A protein has these predicted regions:
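Catalytic cores of the polymerase beta-like nucleotidyltransferase superfamily
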Residues: 1-449, 454
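Single conserved hydrophobic/aromatic residue that forms the stacking wall/gate
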Residues: 450-465
Length: 465
């Protein structure tokens, strides 16, 4: 079997072979190439020890030299080169206490997680596949190398990785491997939130986000996302729904594109339903207040999983407004854009459609038509360049200073009042009209009697008369 290696990978392997060492491309790059995919990076394994690797290449980085890994830099691209090794006993479900370098490739491949990741290749020896990884690729199976309980005991994150690979590749998890995950799921507590987040995002943004169901079934989500377990266990007895909250969530994730923000939003859009559910006298469920409560819960969850502030902000905003249904008028849509932000509206429409498509058929067309009408007005507003952000207001602080106004609280209040007025009446958004309103405000303020001073302190009252 012939694999086309990149030139830099060939160079590294050839240089090591010239010095009498074995070297192979290994792991995910071999797997992806055999699947007809383009590997994101190429890793190399070798019988040469780290110091030898460092001596053979002019630019190297000690990325994990204690565990035998050196990054070789060629034309500003890094290639991890790792010495064959045998791992000692694991004490923290992630790192071995000791590492022993070996000259035996198969011994090195034994320590790897799954058979599909335990294949090596070079142009001289061809494909080295000691654990039938190629067979598992053909069978579309995720299977541990050796004894699953041992592999997961070495690094508990491998359990979540098993489901992630199943999601990315559309594979199933082999039964003994699956059972070992269920047996050892609680060990995921030993893994950092950052590492869990990385695997979760890869799963969510894969072609099969429905594998979150497997995460739940195997007991993994109860460790890092117990809120999802409650969602899976909360029915929705209402004509608008045909699934539990969790199943609705899974179907909704499938209805949006493979985008990080959208998939996270759909995962969490109904996260508060289990805590907001009520049942009326007819036995029907209601979830009043779940968007606002859900936004707060989403914030807590995303912080717990160490997401960045921008992701938290966007996801929580979309969760907060996913079920917002203002009357579809230009005024209401302008105000919605102002609250939500132009940059978030396309995502909001995607979220609303996905939410609807994951519900029952009850009034589905009516709901979709509402979203279409909402979006149509939104696009018309953008086309006409109507003011929906304060920065689009036809005047600014410099213009007010030129009118004799001092900087400070009053200026901010006046600009806000003008902005509110323009949201209602977009035709007012030209410099002359707005300056005339400001002038009117100033004249009115000067001419009013003392007993009305308190009323006149509101710029909103003055501008909007």
């Amino acid at each position: 079997m012939k694999i086309q290696l990149p030139e830099h990978v060939k160079q590294i392997i050839h240089r090591l072979q010239q010095e009498g060492y074995d070297a192979y491309a290994v792991g995910g790059c071999v797997r992806d190439t055999l699947l007809g995919r383009s590997p994101q990076d190429w890793d190399i394994t070798t019988s040469a020890k780290p110091q030898v690797v460092k001596s053979l290449f002019s630019h190297t980085i000690d990325t994990g030299i204690a565990h035998g890994t050196v990054t070789v830099m060629l034309d500003h691209t890094g290639y991890e080169v790792t010495t064959y090794r045998i791992d000692g006993e694991y004490e923290d479900a992630r790192h071995p206490k000791t590492v022993t370098f070996t000259g035996n490739l198969v011994e090195d491949l034994k320590r790897r997680d799954f058979t599909i990741n335990a294949m090596a290749y070079n142009d001289t020896a061809g494909l080295v596949d000691a654990f039938d990884g190629i067979g598992d690729l053909k069978r579309h199976v995720i299977r541990c190398v050796g004894i699953p309980h041992d592999r997961f005991g070495e690094d508990a994150l491998r359990m979540l990785r098993a489901v992630r690979f199943a999601a990315q590749l559309g594979f199933s998890i082999e039964e003994k491997t699956r059972q070992a995950v269920a047996d050892l799921a609680d060990n995921l507590q030993k893994v950092s939130a950052e590492r869990i987040q990385t695997e979760m995002v890869k799963l969510l943004t894969s072609a099969h986000p429905e594998e979150m169901r497997t995460v739940y079934e195997l007991g993994l989500s109860r460790v890092f996302l117990p809120e999802f377990d409650r969602m899976m266990e909360t029915p929705q007895i209402t004509k608008h729904h045909c699934y539990s909250v969790g199943e609705h969530t899974i179907h909704a994730m499938q209805e949006v594109q493979q985008d990080r923000i959208l998939r996270l939003t759909m995962l969490l859009h109904d996260v508060a339903k289990p805590v907001c559910v009520t049942t009326d006298e007819k036995g029907q469920n209601h979830f009043k207040g779940h968007p606002a409560e859900g936004a707060e819960m989403a914030r807590v969850i995303l912080r717990r999983l160490k997401f960045d502030n921008e992701t938290i902000k966007r996801v929580c905003l979309l969760v907060r407004y996913h079920d917002d249904r203002p009357a579809v008028t230009p005024r209401n849509v302008r105000r919605a854009i102002s609250r939500i932000g132009v940059e978030n509206m396309e995502a909001l429409f995607a979220v609303k459609r996905a939410d609807t498509l994951a519900q029952s058929m009850y009034e589905r067309q009516k709901k979709l038509s509402y979203i279409d009408a909402y979006e149509e007005i939104y696009r018309e507003i953008l086309k006409e360049h109507q003011c929906v952000q304060k920065k689009d207001l036809a005047i600014n602080g410099r213009d007010l200073i030129a009118q004799g106004m001092k900087t400070g609280k009053e200026m901010g209040e006046v600009l806000q009042a003008l902005y509110e007025q323009v949201l209602d009446e977009p035709q007012l958004n030209n410099k002359e009209t707005l300056l005339a309103l400001v002038l009117q405000l100033q004249q009115t303020k000067q001419g009013r009697s003392e007993e009305h001073t308190s009323e006149l302190q509101s710029p909103l009252n003055l501008v909007c008369r």
